[in-house]
Regions:
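N-terminal secretory signal peptides and thylakoid transit peptides that target proteins
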Residues: 1-15
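Active-site acidic/histidine proton-transfer and metal-coordination neighborhood
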Residues: 19, 52, 88-182, 270
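C-terminal segment of N-terminal export signals and the immediately downstream linker at the start
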Residues: 22-46, 54
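Conserved, mostly hydrophobic/aromatic
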Residues: 35, 55, 63, 82, ...
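Short, acidic/polar
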Residues: 43-54, 97-105, 194-200, 243
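Catalytic domains of carbohydrate-active enzymes, especially glycoside hydrolases
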Residues: 51-68
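Glycine-rich, proline-tolerant flexible connector loops at the mouths of alpha/beta enzymes
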Residues: 64-79
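Acidic/histidine-rich catalytic cores of soluble enzymes
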Residues: 146-240, 247
Length: 285
C-alpha cells in the first residue's frame, strides 16, 4: 500500500520534462497507448482527477476502466472526468457476475469495447464450465453488437489449464462466434501460463483487437494456477517478454488499442507507468 505522500511523489516524478516528449509512435500506425486503471485503483479512489491528469501528463492517451468503477459513480460522471483530463475511454472491464446489467452503463460511458474480466473460479475449473462461459459470451456478444459495441473476454493464466487434452482457452475460442466475441490478450498471463504471446498473435490475430501489456520477471516457473504465487509483475521492458516482436506484430495484425497494466507495483504506480511508457517509446522508436 502506498501513502498519499508516496502517491504525490510518484505523480511529480511522472511529470518530468521527459514525459513531454512526443510519442515515439506518433508517426506510425501503431495502436494508441493507454492505461488499464486497475493499475492505479487506490489512487483513482483517492483522487480521480489528479490521477487521470498524471496519466495524461506522462503521455498516455486512453484509459480502460476496471470492474468496480461502475459501482462507484455514474457513467456520465466518469466519462466527464476522463474527458476533462484530455483522455478517451474506448474500453471497459466488467465482472462476469452482473455483466448483463452493465450494457447501458457501457453505452453511456461511450465504450467501443465491453470486456469480461475473467471466467469465475466457480465455473472455470472444468471443461463444462468453460463451455457454459462460451455460451454466455456469445449471448453478450450479440447484445453488444445490437448496441453498437464489441464484446471481448480477457484472459488470466487459469484458462490454459488442461482438461483431457484440451484447455479452457481452446474451448472458449472454439465455441465462441468470431463475429461476436473478440479476445483481449493479456500478454503477461499468456506468458505466465507457459504460452508465447507472439505465437498467439500469429494464430489468433484476427480475433485480437485490444491488448494488455505487462511484463514478467525472470526466474519464475510458469503456472496455470491463479494465485499470489503467479504474480511476477514488473514494468514493461524490465522483464522477459519480447516486446519488439509483440508490438510489431500487434501493429501488423491490426490491434486497435493497447493498455499498460501492472496489477501490483514495488514503487508508486504512477512511477511504474512512467517507466513502462519510457521503455515503450524506446521499443517503438
Amino acid at each position: 500500500m502506498h501513502t498519499r505522500r508516496e502517491f504525490l511523489a510518484g505523480t511529480l516524478a511522472g511529470l518530468t520534462t521527459a514525459s513531454l516528449a512526443p510519442l515515439a509512435f506518433a508517426s506510425r500506425s501503431a495502436p494508441p497507448l493507454g492505461v488499464q486503471l486497475y493499475t492505479v485503483r487506490k489512487q483513482v479512489d483517492a483522487n480521480l482527477a489528479g490521477t487521470l491528469a498524471a496519466i495524461r501528463k506522462i503521455g498516455y492517451r486512453t484509459v480502460e476502466t476496471y470492474t468496480s468503477q461502475a459501482n462507484k459513480m455514474t457513467a456520465q460522471e466518469l466519462r466527464k472526468a476522463i474527458q476533462d483530463a484530455g483522455l478517451t475511454v474506448p474500453s471497459g472491464h466488467f465482472s462476469y457476475d452482473g455483466f448483463d446489467t452493465k450494457f447501458d452503463y457501457a453505452k453511456q460511458l461511450g465504450l467501443k469495447f465491453v470486456v469480461c474480466s475473467s471466467v469465475p473460479k466457480s465455473i472455470g475449473n472444468s471443461l463444462d464450465g468453460f463451455k457454459r462461459a462460451a455460451e454466455q459470451y456469445n449471448t453478450w456478444g450479440a447484445k453488444a453488437k445490437q448496441m453498437g459495441m464489441q464484446f471481448a473476454f480477457h484472459n488470466h493464466n487459469s484458462e490454459f489449464q488442461s482438461f483431457n487434452g484440451t484447455t479452457g482457452f481452446d474451448e472458449l475460442m472454439k465455441e465462441t462466434d468470431p463475429a461476436l466475441v473478440q479476445w483481449q490478450m493479456d500478454c503477461y498471463w499468456v506468458a505466465e501460463a507457459g504460452q508465447r504471446p507472439v505465437a498467439m498473435l500469429h494464430k489468433y490475430g484476427h480475433r485480437i483487437t485490444t491488448l494488455h501489456l505487462k511484463d514478467r520477471k525472470a526466474g519464475a516457473a510458469p503456472s496455470v494456477e491463479l494465485n499470489a504465487k503467479s504474480q511476477h509483475f514488473t514494468e514493461i521492458g524490465n522483464g522477459t517478454l519480447d516486446w519488439k516482436k509483440i508490438l510489431r506484430l500487434a501493429e501488423k495484425q491490426g490491434v486497435r488499442y493497447m493498455f499498460v497494466e501492472q496489477d501490483t507495483t514495488e514503487r508508486p504506480p504512477i512511477e511504474s507507468l512512467q517507466i513502462s511508457y519510457d521503455n515503450l517509446q524506446k521499443l517503438l522508436s
